[in-house]
């Protein structure tokens, strides 16, 4: 789970400061040896942790991916199906956050996450902003601009990329074309947590809770 807290410029909704970046990993919690009740209990505690962050930073809104996942056979084995269909408990988390938002007076905005991981990694990903945080930044940007026409996708930006990327991707019309091109070339674009975990400024493993927190 990637979290980021942003402060947007009142005069330019595409400009913002990143105030806080955090990853909460639940790998141990997702193991088959963990009971559903234990898993749900710890997920609810994570919701309270998020709620505390919102109050600490005086946030007015929480931004989430608008996802609908139907139970199905993904064709990758029972363990993978279980992780996709059962373990995530997304509805539990969303409903708890909505309950807390009603109590404490902040808004919840859900947005279409199309290409948010790809765009997030390309625009915001770096050695101190791993994949899931980069994605959360793009989701937050979309949510902040949700009701403004033409703000769903930012213009393609290549200036910060290396020359190989610039030359190969120059002239593409949209992010979908760029994603398909990168996928076809099998280029790595994700800043994976495990590759940059040593850059976390703070980390703590909660053994009983089976959760690890990283702050970047």
Please describe what each predicted stretch is.
Residues 1-216:
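Positively charged, helix-rich recognition surfaces that bind polyanionic ligands
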């Amino acid at each position: 789970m990637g979290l980021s807290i942003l402060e947007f410029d009142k005069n330019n909704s595409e400009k913002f400061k990143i105030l806080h970046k955090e990853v909460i990993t639940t790998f141990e919690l997702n193991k088959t040896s963990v009971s559903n009740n234990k898993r749900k209990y710890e997920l609810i505690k994570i919701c309270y942790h998020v709620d505390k962050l919102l109050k600490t930073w005086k946030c007015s809104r929480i931004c989430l991916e608008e996802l609908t996942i139907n139970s199905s056979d993904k064709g990758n084995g029972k363990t993978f199906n279980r992780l996709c269909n059962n373990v995530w408990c997304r509805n539990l988390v969303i409903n708890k956050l909505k309950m807390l938002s009603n109590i404490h007076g902040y808004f919840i905005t859900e947005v279409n996450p199309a290409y948010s991981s790809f765009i997030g990694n390309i625009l915001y990903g770096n050695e101190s902003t791993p994949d899931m945080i980069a994605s959360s930044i793009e989701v937050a940007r979309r949510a902040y601009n949700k009701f403004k026409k033409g703000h769903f996708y930012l213009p393609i930006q290549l200036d910060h990329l290396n020359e190989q990327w610039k030359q190969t991707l120059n002239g593409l019309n949209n992010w979908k074309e760029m994603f398909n091109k990168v996928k076809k070339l099998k280029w790595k674009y994700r800043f994976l947590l495990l590759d940059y975990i040593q850059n976390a400024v703070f980390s703590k493993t909660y053994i009983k809770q089976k959760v690890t927190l990283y702050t970047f």
